[in-house]
């Protein structure tokens, strides 16, 4: 029962999986993590703008069914650059996106995570930074972000161990100079306009198919390399939800993305917009005085994000959406050459157990 006295479905714990042949973690491994009911998936061979065909989606369903996982959440159906820039060709790519939504609905998908970040997806300067306990983690060094963006892109691509990463497609990164030129005239105001155009075009289909579009926060939450960022703080989240005020226009609220800026109070945003959060990412970051930050374990005291306050805010509002541990350290045998940066097995599994332990205790304190 939520605070309105309504009967709801319980929060569903998810685990991001990159697919057979593209993820060193198996579905059998994930099945052994208590509490996981949902595989957060995507067709990682698809380029932005392409239609996800029914036959391709059915193949993923076939892989998940023996393990009893649902495929309710897709992360991500990436948005083509022509839509973000607002080129005349965008309507064709929007039509493809609409067809993909319709095809996904045939398989019970409920949430599509996406982002509207120009050129780059998440951005880090070190993928295997020593934490101090023998593990490594994703790290952002503020002084290096002003260097050549191509150098940073090459570093990331060269350390993906041949694995895919949405937003870092080699085909796109090979045209980095062209992409920067494409986005050069796009102001923050224009990017907001183009996002609104995209959402207004797809909302009728989302309602028809009962699929929520859940935008991911910009990571990190500030402009980089002269490129504008939109979802960066509480004010911009408010603006986004009013921009297209529709129950199918929702958030993927990523605690670590927002709290890379220590001024952002994620728990307050959760409390204010719980009904518009379709998907929750729980990530912990440690801040440094020079503007650097490191990703940390999910344990509250290991970072500065306020994980306990955030989980309590979700619990207090009767959160009924999907949640997953977002990023983790690389532990024990994991390291360069054998793990997708930020997406090892062990620390994310530990994070799930921490999150569920907190949730169980909150339930117990409420007498559930």
Regions from the PLM with identified roles:
Residues 5-14, 19-21, 28, 62-65, ...:
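Histidine-acidic metal/acid-base catalytic patches
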Residues 9-49, 56, 63-68:
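Ligand-binding pocket scaffold of soluble enzyme catalytic domains
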Residues 19, 43-44, 77, 117, ...:
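Residue-level "edge-of-site" marker
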Residues 37, 72, 277-278:
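A short, local hydrophobic-aromatic micro-motif
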Residues 40, 73-74, 228:
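Generic secondary-structure boundary/loop-capping signal
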Residues 45-193, 207-208, 257, 315:
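Structural motif corresponding to the early beta-alpha repeats
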């Amino acid at each position: 029962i939520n605070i309105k006295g309504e009967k709801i479905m319980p929060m569903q714990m998810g685990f991001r999986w990159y697919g057979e042949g593209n993820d060193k973690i198996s579905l059998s491994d994930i099945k052994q993590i208590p509490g996981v009911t949902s595989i957060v998936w995507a067709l990682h061979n698809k380029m932005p703008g392409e239609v996800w065909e029914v036959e391709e989606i059915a193949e993923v369903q076939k892989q998940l069914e023996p393990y009893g996982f649902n495929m309710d959440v897709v992360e991500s159906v990436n948005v083509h650059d022509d839509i973000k820039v607002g080129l005349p060709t965008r309507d064709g790519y929007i039509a493809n996106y609409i067809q993909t939504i319709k095809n996904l609905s045939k398989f019970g998908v409920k949430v599509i995570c996406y982002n509207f970040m120009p050129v780059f997806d998440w951005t880090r300067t070190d993928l295997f930074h020593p934490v101090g306990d023998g593990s490594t983690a994703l790290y952002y060094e503020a002084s290096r972000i002003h260097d050549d963006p191509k150098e940073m892109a090459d570093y990331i691509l060269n350390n993906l161990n041949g694995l895919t990463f949405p937003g870092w497609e080699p085909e796109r990164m090979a045209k980095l100079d062209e992409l920067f030129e494409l986005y050069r005239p796009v102001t923050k105001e224009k990017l907001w306009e183009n996002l609104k155009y995209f959402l207004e075009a797809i909302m009728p289909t989302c309602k028809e198919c009962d699929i929520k579009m859940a935008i991911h926060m910009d990571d990190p939450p500030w402009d980089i390399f002269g490129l504008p960022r939109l979802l960066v703080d509480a004010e911009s989240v408010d603006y986004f939800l009013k921009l297209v005020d529709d129950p199918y226009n929702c958030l993927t609220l990523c605690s670590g993305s927002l709290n890379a800026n220590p001024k952002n109070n994620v728990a307050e945003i959760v409390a204010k917009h719980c009904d518009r959060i379709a998907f929750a990412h729980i990530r912990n970051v440690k801040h440094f005085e020079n503007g650097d930050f490191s990703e940390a374990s999910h344990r509250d005291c290991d970072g500065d994000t306020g994980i306990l306050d955030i989980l309590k805010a979700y619990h207090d509002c009767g959160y009924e959406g999907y949640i997953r541990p977002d990023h983790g350290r690389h532990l024990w045998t994991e390291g360069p050459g054998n793990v997708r940066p930020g997406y090892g097995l062990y620390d994310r599994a530990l994070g799930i157990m921490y999150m569920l332990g907190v949730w169980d205790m909150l339930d117990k304190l409420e007498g559930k």
